[in-house]
Amino acid sequence: MAGEELMKICATGHRSMTKVTYMVKAEGDPKEVYENSKLHLPSPLMASGTLVGGQIESVEKAPYYVLDANGEWIEDREHVTLYFTATTETPSGEVMTTKVGDQEVRIGKTDYILKSEYIEFQGGTVVDVRWGE
């Protein structure tokens, strides 16, 4: 595989890239954060103060639930669950170790930091990753 990739680089002058689309869930955020986030999308991805390629494309909201005094799940109307969709490109030979900055992007990864010029969420969970779409 490495030889084939090297031949592609030599023949074309660049590495082939694979588009990666992933979704990050952020729970328990104040409801106004949703509208404010939408104002700044799409927004380029950042890590350690530098652009890393790719962008946060969109955000969707869902209810956020908490336990009440009786142990029942109820909707917290002051907070929401947010689902951010981001895209990036990674060298095709490295698709199995997709990284954005220094962070690996894998389904189930917790404590993910989603950051752009205007948006930052810590403690997110990567809930979906699609390669090549």
Kindly label every feature range from the protein language model.
Residues 1-133:
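Beta-strand/loop-dominated core regions that host nucleotide or nucleotide-derived cofactor-binding catalytic loops
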